[in-house]
Amino acid sequence: GSRWFAAHPAPVPLAGIRANLNLDTVGRLGSGPVRIIATGTASEWPHVFRGVGFTTGIAIQNIEGAGQSSDQQAFIERGIPGVQLFAGASLDYHKPTDTPDKIDAAGMVKVATVAKEAIEYLAARPEPLNATISAAAAAPAQPPPGTPRERRASLGIVPDFAYTARGVRADSIVPGSPAAHAALQAGDVLLTVAGQPVDDMQAYSNVLK
């Protein structure tokens, strides 16, 4: 959907879109910070969200990379600075067990407050953000040739999306999963899976397809 919109922008042309704020996985904040993913796409982003945190008193964690984690990537690929507001994944991530009764409403108010403050700043700013999008960040994610689009396997780790070093760090482990049977623990970092290198989340996703 986001890539289609970016390819067929209406009623506003791409030249009129200064930034993208994407709210994705914001229902389980708990006591954690509001994570801002892909702040490396504009030089102002880290300062904007530090200011929002100071003004609102809401804990915020700026994460420079991981732009390909969600729909902001469709805009980043076209040179538009984009970020994702993220509350953190849970063991119910992408499962039918992610039911409405588990939503942290107070946490969502915090996320909405952060979004509101950032949007008001952008609306009042007379000039565009200074995009700092690298060629690697702007490149569309491409699975290896012959890789089916559907995910065929699950290891059973909930990734730590705030982790930006090499590999994929487990935030938590799904009980009874292959990862649990292999004695993986929260905090462990995957560097290879089935003999294939796993340098980042995109590589990990491709291995499981």
Predicted regions and their residues:
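Short, structured secondary-structure boundary patches
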Residues: 81-85, 97-109, 193, 200-203, ...
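Metal-dependent peptidase/peptidase-like ectodomains
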Residues: 2-90, 104, 108
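Sec/Tat-exported extracytoplasmic proteins
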Residues: 9, 25, 52-57, 86, ...
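Generic beta-structure capping elements
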Residues: 24, 88, 96, 160-162, ...
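Solvent-exposed, polar/charged alpha-helical surfaces in well-ordered, non-transmembrane soluble domains
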Residues: 3, 47-51, 73, 106-120, ...
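Extended hydrophobic-aromatic, low-complexity segments
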Residues: 2, 32, 61, 84, ...
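C-terminal recognition in membrane/secretory proteostasis and scaffolding
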Residues: 129-209
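His/Asp/Glu-rich mid-to-C-terminal helical/loop segments that flank catalytic regions of hydrolases
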Residues: 91-138
